[in-house]
Amino acid sequence: MGYDDGAGDFTFAASLDKAVEIGMMTRASADCILQKQYALYRRDLVDLSVSALTTPLADGSATLAESLAKKGVFTWEEGRAQGLIGGGQESYVHSSLRNTGAPKPEQSASSGAVSRVTKTYALPSGSVSADVITVDTSAPGVSVRAAMVNQKLGASAPFSSIVSASGADVIVNANFFAAYSGQDKFPVGHVMADGTFLYGVSGLTSFGFTGSGAVYVGRPAVFFYIRGGRNSWACYEMNSKTQGSDLSVVYTPAFGGSVPIKIDGTATTVAGGVITDVRAVAAGETVAIPANGYVMVFGSDFTSTTWYREPSVGTSVTLTPGLTDSDTSGFPMEEITAMVSGGPRLVENGAICTTLEPGFQEARFTSAVTSRTALGKLADGKLVIVSTGSASIQQLRELMLQLGCVEAVNLDGGGSTALAYQGKLIRSPGRELTTTLQIFTH
């Protein structure tokens, strides 16, 4: 990939720049390789290739070696034998500056950490055939990640493409989204990936996962707090298209390059952690979203409250998610690294839950029999993933309870129902997907 000497085709640094450009590694990974100053033999092709092969791809989904093994360039066994997969991996993974819980040893998952059972279950309301995957999320080497296509709201991709690019042992569809023709494909409920919220609208049951493997279930009432100097501002939602005179919403690059303004109010722009612009806006305007920042949109009634303080240009600020004072979910927001949401809730505190949240009272959530996906939590903390080609919500409730779940929620289903296990498509959806939950054991 290049040499440092004068006779080389191009420099070592230039070759790393090219690797970043084509998505072989992140900029941070390339800089890390340079800073480590490996004792390479003239930094030649073989040595650099080993470093590159064991470095995660730009999207963080897998290492280059794992991706190549997935595509059949060489086998997993050959990769492990050469130290390219498993214990030989260098960790150059970007993470947000937050406490993600006690780290787990980086090693291959023990046998039994992930298991799959396919069978027909006899239930009070009728038999259901399902794939049931149980995951010991606290086992060494196991990690749970939520993923959104291109980390952008509204982006979608065929499930087969998501599976091919991931390298995860288990992939399942997650949040409901506006899926039909002409709709924006935005998700429903919270979505957090790699410790960063991509979408935040409270009200639905969410599954949250920490870096140490703990699983939390509840309806976290999340605010997004921007703090600077002696002042602070609370945004009720993140990247929501809903705007109101009494609301406050924060927009990040996951929303897009700009945000259309629908109400009269104030827009505050933050770039690089510093407030760069504060101005009055009116419905019909558009405000650019910085690639390294975000925009806060406050409605006119919100800014008229006695406790609102006008932001000042030049103020250094931080953005952190937190729970409202009235929240009872108990989510440790400083430790959560992944979150997906769904509805209706199926099991709560070890008992069947028949309450239907707003938006989940149509026939497809009550009497209809269709393909479904569900997440559950066992009493010992393990995660249960269920995928079935035919079940009613009541049957799904009964199944999750029979499996021993103390908490469970229904995820998107119907034409979105998707499951991949160890690289094989077990259940293919009838449409492109936006958000998935992925389990890694290496």
Predicted regions and their residues:
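N-terminal propeptides
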Residues: M1-T100
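Gly/Ser/Thr/Pro-rich low-complexity, intrinsically disordered segments
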Residues: R98-H442
